[in-house]
């Protein structure tokens, strides 16, 4: 919890306040579905139309959520419920920019020094952090393109920790 509220409620409230978001489909672990529904009702989150059980990996959970949406959906905003302090202005700006792109991601420049390491834990290379960004959520995509990219990833058993990486590969 944060300030007495569950983290997921902070995230859902931020999304709920965005006029361009008309429907939300939270994805919960199967064993947390009842608790999730209870929280949504208790805290008056009205844009949730359904909740969906997650999968083994994050990618499976996102795919389950995407698969539950109406095929007439235009865009999707993917946000991790463990990022409770998302700024509404960031969500709005990402949605605004999707008209000119297939996807829009939130990211911050890397401040740490990043190294690649061989299997024996021996440093192989130091990467130039000027060209590195840490990707976060929200991530906004055109629904048909992201859904097709996810279908291809599933069929090829390609796994990534990030939705934009799936779009890079298949979108």
Language model region names:
Residues 21, 45, 73-74, 100-103:
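Short, high-confidence coil segments that cap the C-terminus of an alpha-helix
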Residues 8, 65, 79-80, 109, ...:
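Residue-level signal for inorganic ion chemistry
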Residues 21-25, 49, 102, 152-154:
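Short active-site oxyanion
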Residues 85-170:
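Conserved core of the sugar-phosphate nucleotidyltransferase
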Residues 1-34:
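N-terminal glycine-rich phosphate-binding loop and ensuing alpha1 helix
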Residues 25-26, 78, 103-106:
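Structural beta-sheet core signal
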Residues 12-16, 40, 69:
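Hydrophobic C-terminal alpha-helix "anchor/cap" residues
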Residues 41-75:
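Short phosphate-binding loop-to-helix
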